[in-house]
């Protein structure tokens, strides 16, 4: 894909710049983040007058989002760019003006007038576009401070010993741990570091090479991708 829009030397140089490490892998062996970076690289490498990026931060971890946002911002200094994005922080960083889209899903959509970035973001959160005197949502979007959870959780629901799993050249190792009943447990980390593999082992979708998860609980699993 990349060599269709640029020379192999330029592709290699650009891949190093965006930490794209899976140039020689088959598509079905590449993570969503790597696929996203590949698509972004193909767009950036092409010589054009107008560049479109449709949700460029999807599937990217925090560090990668910052890197790609910086590259799109640099591109915007000499080219014209249109970005579709859900991440308001990314939009605030890369754009000069914003159109707000609103309407009814699968029924109709309306494109607002062009707004200054800060006005657009505030209007979107408020649910009201003052410049057009239009309410786009019944309620505001508010960010609430998360308070530490207290209460009834404490019983061990799932417990595991040291786990390991090898998949091709990649090896995942996890220390022994547990999940308490009623707990909301987060997993965070860079793309292609094994987050999905770890969760698949806990959900008993994937069998570890080392260690065994001994539990008879019922599991409902939402995968990263739908096959």
For the regions a language model picked out, list residue spans one by one.
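Pre-NBD coupling/linker segments of ABC/ABC-like ATPases
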Residues: 2-12, 103-169, 173-176
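Walker B catalytic motif
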Residues: 26, 53-56, 63
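Conserved ABC ATPase nucleotide-binding domain "signature" region
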Residues: 34-37, 196
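Hydrophobic anchor residue at the start of the ABC signature
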Residues: 40, 68
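Conserved signature/switch motifs of ABC ATPase nucleotide-binding domains
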Residues: 46-48, 77
């Amino acid at each position: 894909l990349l060599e269709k829009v640029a020379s192999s030397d330029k592709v290699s140089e650009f891949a190093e710049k965006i930490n794209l490490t899976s140039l020689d892998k088959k598509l079905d062996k590449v993570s969503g983040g790597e696929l996203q970076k590949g698509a972004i690289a193909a767009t950036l490498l092409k010589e054009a007058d107008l560049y479109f990026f449709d949700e460029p931060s999807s599937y990217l971890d925090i560090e990668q989002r910052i890197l790609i946002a910086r590259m799109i911002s640099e591109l915007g200094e000499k080219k014209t760019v249109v970005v579709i994005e859900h991440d308001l922080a990314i939009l605030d960083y890369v754009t000069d003006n914003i159109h707000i889209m609103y309407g009814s899903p699968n029924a109709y959509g309306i494109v607002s007038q062009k707004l200054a970035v800060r006005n657009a973001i505030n209007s979107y959160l408020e649910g009201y576009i003052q410049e057009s005197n239009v309410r786009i949502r019944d309620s505001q979007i508010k960010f609430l401070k998360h308070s530490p959870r207290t209460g009834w959780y404490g019983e061990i629901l799932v417990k595991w010993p040291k786990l390991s799993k090898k998949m091709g050249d990649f090896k995942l190792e996890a220390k022994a741990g547990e999940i308490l009943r009623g707990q909301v447990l987060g997993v965070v980390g860079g793309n292609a570091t094994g987050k999905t593999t770890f969760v698949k082992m806990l959900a008993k979708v994937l069998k570890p090479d080392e260690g065994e998860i001994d539990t008879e609980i019922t599991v409902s699993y939402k995968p990263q991708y739908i096959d």
